[in-house]
Amino acid sequence: MMPPWLLARTLIMALFFSCLTPGSLNPCIEVVPNITYQCMDQKLSKVPDDIPSSTKNIDLSFNPLKILKSYSFSNFSELQWLDLSRCEIETIEDKAWHGLHHLSNLILTGNPIQSFSPGSFSGLTSLENLVAVETKLASLESFPIGQLITLKKLNVAHNFIHSCKLPAYFSNLTNLVHVDLSYNYIQTITVNDLQFLRENPQVNLSLDMSLNPIDFIQDQAFQGIKLHELTLRGNFNSSNIMKTCLQNLAGLHVHRLILGEFKDERNLEIFEPSIMEGLCDVTIDEFRLTYTNDFSDDIVKFHCLANVSAMSLAGVSIKYLEDVPKHFKWQSLSIIRCQLKQFPTLDLPFLKSLTLTMNKGSISFKKVALPSLSYLDLSRNALSFSGCCSYSDLGTNSLRHLDLSFNGAIIMSANFMGLEELQHLDFQHSTLKRVTEFSAFLSLEKLLYLDISYTNTKIDFDGIFLGLTSLNTLKMAGNSFKDNTLSNVFANTTNLTFLDLSKCQLEQISWGVFDTLHRLQLLNMSHNNLLFLDSSHYNQLYSLSTLDCSFNRIETSKGILQHFPKSLAFFNLTNNSVACICEHQKFLQWVKEQKQFLVNVEQMTCATPVEMNTSLVLDFNNSTCYMYKTIISVSVVSVIVVSTVAFLIYHFYFHLILIAGCKKYSRGESIYDAFVIYSSQNEDWVRNELVKNLEEGVPRFHLCLHYRDFIPGVAIAANIIQEGFHKSRKVIVVVSRHFIQSRWCIFEYEIAQTWQFLSSRSGIIFIVLEKVEKSLLRQQVELYRLLSRNTYLEWEDNPLGRHIFWRRLKNALLDGKASNPEQTAEEEQETATWT
């Protein structure tokens, strides 16, 4: 019987191995389940057995497979793409590809294959692309691919092939369209080498012979041969050899001929114009010249290419292109990465397409005369335009495509008059000037595509897009709007399906901006400064499927979120400043409920409060809000009650003291004739004028002044009430600008009103010391009303005015004053003496 400990170990091991799935030991990476597997550089010596039979794509590159044995891939009947690059394969046995009836792409790059058997490629009945670069292949004759009747592209570059002779089995490859023989050791091309092409004129083959050290092409080697494309780049060591070889291309009919060199590999120091004379006997539809040094500016020497339909110059050191003969029948001209010092002067009646891009150096646009031009690409040149754009600039009214992107300053001076056929217009990353001063696009009713992204445009004119009734794509990212508010500029573009407003510094959206865009499908509002998500802006977008509001500062929603269009399928709200607080509970709950169309909702994080920073929005717990609401409600009610009681006590405290004082002093005599309320700014006038004339004059009055009569150690408010109001018959209010602006003076005045009401007598005398603006006076409504309805004294600093002022003031103070015989006699005596 098995010992217990041994039985336990056995069961544990059995359980462990039973949990392992077949794929758990597979070193390959599952890119697409059951479809694509990445097994690169896993030190595999054979094809893994546990890859699913349904696999269509396998990358086995950089594994030491050494030998491909028969039936190596028989388990992968659905395989379509196979990469065996640099697997050290030396031998391919017969039937190695057995069962791969659907394989269309096979890559054997970098394998030192020593020899091929006749059946090395048997079974590949659907192969279309075969790459055998760096496989030590010595000739096409020894390459057994005659049975690959579906083959379209053959790449045998960078091998040891010395002859370009196309074997007889090529007649079986009726679908072959491209053969790459570049970077081999082919030095000569003879008549017999291309006999297959001569006997099969129906073959439309592209042949790449670049980087072969060709020094001789036999006369009539290409006579009667038809090719789709012939590439001869970096083949010739001297101009004379190149000229002779090109002359021996006579009789060739080629759709596209590519000559020249490579950017980093130059054999010819000087490209002499006479070289091109060798092409006069070659029928060429399209010609391309690449990376040549010291190229002649005399384009007339291209007379052998006068009848080509397309001319292309790429990386050519040409500095001027002018005086191109009008009889040249070029329909397409491309000038890419050249070194032009000025814009080409062109007058070509047949030219339909002009591409001038990535020129090395800044140039200014010049007017051209191209009546047939329909396509114009002038992008990435640092071009400057002093005026754009109209028929007079281009000399054509057939233009449909205009690309002026990635240039310098473009001054808009016309509204495309004569260019009404335009359908595509691109200004991105150029600086547009004056584009908002008028309706620059008014004539472009047929325009379908407009890109003004990153053009330093500040949109402050709602009519900027007037006339664009057919526009379906509008890109305007990286610009700005007046007051950072998206204004109603889309009223006329009712056919828009794509609108990009990203990085426009937008903070607000005007009401009804999108209401006419019923066909809009994609709206990009990302990378702006929007604070709220307002669904009412989008409820008229009946066709909207994608809305991107990511990278804004959105904290919460505004309004009812159910207003989003039913067609909306993708909505991106990531990277916003979402506030995960109970105040925004409805918005947070809505986010949780809309997982089906919110993009990357599981990555949405909270920005505030601080304790929830970087927390996931989906983790916000709504239940805590109910508890908080109860606590907050009780707290708020308590605070309101306490605050109300405190406010009432504070507000009426002094009035209560005043009432109590009135009862206390109601039967006693007043000590003072008047209590003076004034601003400290007017104290000089009170001391030098008021006190001097009333207390030292005739009759004498006794005034209550705070700086003299208030009791030290007692609160100011208590002194005002007890010493000022309760012991005075009247109150003198000295009104001035500073008085109205002083909160303390206004407080004293309000207490005086209460005192007057409680004493049931007219005891307040107003003195307007200086002219006070009505606007300032209206700030104190009650004071303004009293001054409007009651008589007051105005101080006038002149003899007559002073005399009247003091007489009226003394009469007002005498009103209600009890008579004192001794004081009256004394005053009469002083009066007589004074008289």
UniProtKB/Swiss-Prot annotation:
Question: Span of the secretion signal?
Answer: 1-25
Q: Which terms under GO biological process does the entry name? A: activation of innate immune response; activation of NF-kappaB-inducing kinase activity; astrocyte development; B cell proliferation; B cell proliferation involved in immune response; cellular response to amyloid-beta; cellular response to lipopolysaccharide; cellular response to lipoteichoic acid
Q: What happens when the gene is disrupted?
A: Mice infected with C.neoformans var. grubii serotype A (strain KN99) display reduced Arg1/arginase-1 expression in interstitial macrophages as well as reduced pulmonary fungal burden and eosinophilia. Animals with a double knockout of Apoe and Tlr4, fed a Western diet for 12 weeks, have less aortic plaque formation than single Apoe knockout mice. They also show lower serum concentrations of Il1a, Ilb and Il18.
Q: What is the lineage of its organism?
A: Eukaryota, Metazoa, Chordata, Craniata, Vertebrata
Gene Ontology CC, one term: receptor complex
- Glycosylated sites: 34, 75, 172, 204, 237, 307, 492, 495, 524, 572, 575, 613, 621-622
Any S-S bridges, and between which cysteines? 28-39, 280-304, 388-389, 580-606, 582-625
Q: List the GO molecular function terms.
A: identical protein binding; lipopolysaccharide binding; lipopolysaccharide immune receptor activity; NAD+ nucleosidase activity, cyclic ADP-ribose generating; protein heterodimerization activity; signaling receptor binding; transmembrane signaling receptor activity
Which PANTHER family does the annotation name?
Answer: TOLL-LIKE RECEPTOR, TOLL-LIKE RECEPTOR 4
Q: What happens after mutating residue 637 to I?
A: In strain: P/J
- Coiled-coil residue windows: none
Tissue occurrence: Expressed in macrophages (at protein level). Highly expressed in heart, spleen, lung and muscle. Lower levels are found in liver and kidney.
Q: What is this protein called?
A: Toll-like receptor 4
Q: Repeat LRR: residue ranges? A: 54-75, 78-99, 102-123, 126-147, 150-171, 175-198, 204-224, 226-247, 248-269, 329-349, 350-370, 372-392, 398-420, 421-442, 446-467, 470-490, 495-516, 519-540, 543-564
Q: Supply the SUPFAM superfamilies for this chain.
A: L domain-like, Toll/Interleukin receptor TIR domain
Q: Where is this region: Interaction with SCIMP?
A: 670-835
Record disease entry: The protein is encoded by the Lps locus, an important susceptibility locus, influencing the propensity to develop a disseminated Gram-negative infection.
Domain comment? The TIR domain mediates interaction with NOX4.
Q: Which gene encodes it?
A: Tlr4
Main function: Transmembrane receptor that functions as a pattern recognition receptor recognizing pathogen- and damage-associated molecular patterns (PAMPs and DAMPs) to induce innate immune responses via downstream signaling pathways. At the plasma membrane, cooperates with LY96 to mediate the innate immune response to bacterial lipopolysaccharide (LPS). Also involved in LPS-independent inflammatory responses triggered by free fatty acids, such as palmitate, and Ni(2+). Mechanistically, acts via MYD88, TIRAP and TRAF6, leading to NF-kappa-B activation, cytokine secretion and the inflammatory response. (Microbial infection) Required for the virulence of fungus C.neoformans var. grubii serotype A (strain KN99) CPL1. Independently of Ly96/Md2, activated by CPL1 which results in a type 2 inflammation response characterized by Arg1/arginase-1 induction in interstitial macrophages.
Extracellular-side stretches of the chain, per the record, are 26-638
Where found in the cell?
Answer: Cell membrane; Early endosome; Cell projection, Ruffle
